[in-house]
């Protein structure tokens, strides 16, 4: 947080995605007020300070979230911006390879997680690069904020990437939406409820557990890392 001399507050962040202005223009993220490069090369940005709160797990069934993800995933302009910034389109194999490259040794050697990764490699879902979209990459409830006026925004864009939109969709469904409500959620988003879609949900859902396990492990939050492993076993 930063504060102006007149007492106004702003949300200040270092080295976040350069597309914040475009995200704000599409009302996906809070308004970008300014950005400047510091002497050491870091980029500092300031966003509008929002009076509100972080969403809880129980808030994640809001239709606003589906609308936000839909607007994000349908934006060709944002895809083109990321391509101009040298982001690369990632297919399912790329995602798994990156996880294996970056996951802690203890996770890579975990027998259960090894089995999950091997199974995901054997059942790579269909992927077409020409319809890859921008995805947030970490659509946890703690990365959504709701203002006092009831508007929801998506924040913390450090994990943004270009891949299948199911990357975000499956994280929401696997972590927050009861199975019985999946058909209604998918219909509102615009997906057909068929075997191909369900197979993708289960693939990307399992992968979302892997990414969350790795994030929590890296931050030494073993309670939540173990919780994700437990939920992955049940998924």
Language-model features: locations:
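A glycine-centered beta->alpha junction motif in the catalytic cores
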Residues: 38-58, 93-104, 207-222
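Helix-rich C-terminal or lid/interface subdomains of diverse kinases
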Residues: 174-176, 183-235
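Active-site Asp-x-Gly
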Residues: 147-197
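Short beta->alpha connector loops
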Residues: 14-17, 53, 137, 176, ...
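An alpha-helical support segment within catalytic cores of ATP-dependent transferases
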Residues: 77-137
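ATP-binding pocket architecture of kinase catalytic cores
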Residues: 1-83
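Active-site acidic catalytic loop and adjacent metal/ATP-binding pocket
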Residues: 1-2, 121-169
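Structured catalytic cores of enzymes that bind and process phosphorylated ligands/cofactors
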Residues: 73-85, 132-135, 144, 162, ...
